[in-house]
């Protein structure tokens, strides 16, 4: 058995560094979680342009945050958006695994199960996050920016394809549908409790604890 993991919102919660950065930069009383959700929507609208180098990282950061605030009838300046982005990146570089997720990787190591990470994103940013989560990166890391393909493209999943490979991710379309169409077994980490067709998904888990239990089951433990 081999297990590859998505990074963002699977091994850690994307919302956590956003929340901490907001608390440091802005004083406005607002539903921070809803603001974050809005920012993710606007991020996804133009993220492919960023990956294709049509826009800069700063332009992406300004766009997603200003648009999200605008939905709350609040205007912020480009400078405020960039100040937030700087603090946000700092918080992203100081993320950590939960205690149970640490157990997951301790178990995989002890049982000598091959594992790795497959993620979309820019190489430098993703490596920075992984270094924050793991003391030593002694496993394969596949990043879309480096290999030239991105989820849900079949080609990126074929890099890990094997009869006994499982892919763990929170994304329904880019992770589960993408991996499944490439012939890879899937574990959907549905921590948002989305209502979707799961008939083609091998396992659905809703917490770190459930993920650990499924992995033990797959390893006949």
Role assignments for model-derived ranges:
Residues 28-39, 71-84, 136-138:
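Short, surface-exposed acidic
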Residues 18-23, 58-66, 123:
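An amphipathic alpha-helix signature
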Residues 58-59, 78, 86-116, 154:
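Short, acidic loop-to-helix structural element flanking the phosphoryl-transfer center
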């Amino acid at each position: 058995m081999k297990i590859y993991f998505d990074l963002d919102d699977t091994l850690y919660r994307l919302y956590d560094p956003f929340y901490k950065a907001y608390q440091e930069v802005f004083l406005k009383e607002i539903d921070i979680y809803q603001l974050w959700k809005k920012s993710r929507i606007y991020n996804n609208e133009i993220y492919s342009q960023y990956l294709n180098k049509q826009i800069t990282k700063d332009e992406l950061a300004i766009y997603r945050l200003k648009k999200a605030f605008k939905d709350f009838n609040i205007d912020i300046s480009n400078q405020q958006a960039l100040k937030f982005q700087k603090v946000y990146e700092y918080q992203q570089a100081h993320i950590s695994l939960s205690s149970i997720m640490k157990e997951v990787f301790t178990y995989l190591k002890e049982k000598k199960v091959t594992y790795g990470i497959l993620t979309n994103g820019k190489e430098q940013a993703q490596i920075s996050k992984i270094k924050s989560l793991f003391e030593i990166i002694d496993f394969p890391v596949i990043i879309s920016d480096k290999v030239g393909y991105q989820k849900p493209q079949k080609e990126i999943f074929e890099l890990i394809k094997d009869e006994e490979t499982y892919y763990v991710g929170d994304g329904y379309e880019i992770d589960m549908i993408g991996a499944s169409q490439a012939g890879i077994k899937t574990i959907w980490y549905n921590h948002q409790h989305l209502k979707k067709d799961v008939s083609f998904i091998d396992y659905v888990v809703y917490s770190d604890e459930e993920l650990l239990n499924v992995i033990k089951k797959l390893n006949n433990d």
